[in-house]
């Protein structure tokens, strides 16, 4: 009884359960737990802090100063000592509208950072969907490879029986053994590739390798409809966050160039002071303006102009890049749809049924070993090609959604 209790404890508490997960759940988990995305989101707080600073009414803090001194009186004035002291309060003011330009720079930077975060989410969603698709495909290939191993084992058993009966030669038995060894090797390779794909998916999801989960879903069995190419281009320009980010960068550099030009105009410093000595009290105002003779922000203006021109060029290049990506994704989807339509699920099922009938005919001696071997090869190749066509179709759909920044559904 005690041993039974310990066994139950191990089953329920030490064996990690496999959590079911759909592709939608995987995407949501990645958006909430991916470490790279979490680190990138912190940049929004930095940009928000810079915006708050830019909105300050006065960018410079006031300055307060003071002085104190002691002085001896002449003997003819009675001797002794007296103390002089004074205070001065200064404030620097911008008079060329630099605050408005500074706010424009910070606002566009804040919007650019938010768009950059959205763009990283767009890319992450595509990466998760691609990894999810590859895991499903390898899982399906693993199942097929196990069936192939079982099929080869059955064929080897039949060949040994027929060899003992004198119906076939030893060469056929050797070929069957070689085919079985190759099938087992393929199974090991597929299982290793499947584990590696799971680790990749876990990395995108922010999960530790010891976290066990079971993927729910299947590869597409029917070809999706091909969307309109022009509509895809329009959707990409309108929805993609990286397109908006380049626009915000252009506006930011324009505002920065205006700010550099305004900073040539010197700031005005106003000061109020109070001085006291043994004879009088003095209260007054003081104004100071630096002369921009040597430093006229030449380097800052050149730097801002270069950045503005670079941002404009990058924005134009981004449009062409998006156009190429949409064209490539559209072509890949069209090719994948055409390939998938060549396969019908019913045909694949019938091919497997025909193979079973052929194996039965071989067992009864109606067909030879090489006919069965050739039929197995053709059926296996057709099933593998069908899985690969399904995989390419789903990856093409994922690419379309990535390039357009939306969903085809």
Could you describe each region identified by the protein language model?
Residues 7-16:
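Bacterial N-terminal signal peptides
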Residues 21-27:
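Regulatory alphaC helix of protein kinase catalytic domains
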Residues 104-107, 170-179, 369-377:
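Short, charged, amphipathic alpha-helical segments
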Residues 21, 117-235, 329-332, 336, ...:
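Periplasmic alpha-helical coiled-coil/stalk elements that build and connect Gram-negative outer-membrane
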């Amino acid at each position: 009884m005690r041993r039974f209790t310990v066994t139950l404890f191990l089953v329920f508490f030490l064996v990690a359960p496999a959590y079911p997960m759909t592709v939608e759940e995987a995407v949501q988990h990645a958006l909430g737990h991916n470490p790279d995305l979490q680190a990138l989101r912190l940049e929004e707080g930095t940009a928000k802090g810079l915006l708050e600073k830019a909105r300050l009414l006065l960018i410079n803090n006031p300055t307060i100063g003071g002085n104190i001194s002691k002085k001896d009186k002449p003997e003819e004035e009675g001797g002794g000592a007296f103390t002089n002291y004074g205070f001065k309060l200064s404030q620097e003011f911008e008079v060329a509208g630099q605050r408005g330009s500074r706010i424009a720079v910070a606002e566009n930077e804040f919007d650019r950072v938010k768009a950059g975060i959205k763009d990283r989410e767009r890319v992450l969603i595509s990466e998760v969907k691609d990894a999810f698709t590859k895991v499903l495909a390898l899982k399906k290939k693993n199942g097929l490879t196990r069936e192939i191993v079982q099929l080869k084992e059955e064929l080897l058993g039949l060949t040994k029986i027929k060899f003992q009966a004198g119906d076939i030669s030893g060469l056929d038995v050797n070929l069957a053994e070689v085919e079985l060894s190759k099938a087992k090797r393929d199974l090991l390779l597929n299982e290793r590739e499947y584990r590696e794909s799971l680790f990749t998916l876990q990395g995108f999801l922010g999960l530790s390798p010891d976290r066990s989960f079971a993927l729910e879903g299947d590869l597409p069995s029917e070809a999706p409809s091909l969307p309109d190419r022009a509509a895809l281009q329009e959707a990409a320009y309108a929805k993609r966050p990286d397109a908006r980010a380049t626009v915000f960068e252009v506006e930011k550099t324009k505002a920065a160039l205006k700010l550099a030009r305004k900073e040539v105009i010197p700031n005005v410093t106003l000061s109020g002071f109070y001085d006291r000595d043994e004879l009088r009290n003095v209260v007054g105002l003081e104004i100071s303006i630096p002369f921009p003779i040597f430093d006229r922000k030449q380097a800052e203006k050149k730097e801002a102009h270069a950045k503005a021109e670079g941002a404009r060029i990058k924005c134009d290049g981004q449009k062409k890049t998006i156009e190429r990506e949409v064209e490539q994704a559209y072509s890949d989807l069209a090719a994948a749809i055409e390939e998938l339509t060549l396969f019908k699920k019913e045909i694949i099922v019938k091919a497997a049924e025909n193979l079973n009938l052929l194996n039965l005919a071989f067992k009864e001696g109606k067909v030879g070993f090489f006919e069965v071997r050739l039929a197995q090869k053709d059926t296996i190749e057709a099933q593998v090609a069908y899985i690969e066509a399904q995989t390419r179709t789903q990856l093409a759909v994922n690419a379309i959604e990535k390039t357009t920044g939306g969903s085809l559904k």
